Amino acid sequence: MLKKNVETFMGCDADYKDAKIVLFGAPFDSTTSFRPGTRFASAAIRRESYGLELYSPYQDRELSEFSVFDSGDLELCFGDTKTALSNIEKRAKTILTDGKLPFLIGGEHLVTLGSVRAAVKKY
């Protein structure tokens, strides 16, 4: 079972066992082509999420009604792309195996590949 993050996305407070969605950060930017810094995105997204409107006109409900668990950021080694993608894939696989939906925040675009690999193997 994953541990709860202290600073959560939009203040989500579900327990892991009850959550349908599990958020995790992948702070990685080793292959960016212009300016590094996307590794700080997951922390910035969480910090700014407290100011978001909770009502979704698309869902016609409060986003706080969704059962979300924030498992925090992975510790990813700068410069080791292969290991970073493997770690992201492992986290996504754990979440999928537990019957939950992974919600990845990054990081550069490449971090998506790890989660996609896990989903392809499952489905």
Language-model features, listed with the residues they occupy:
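Metal-dependent C-N hydrolase catalytic cores
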Residues: M1-Y123
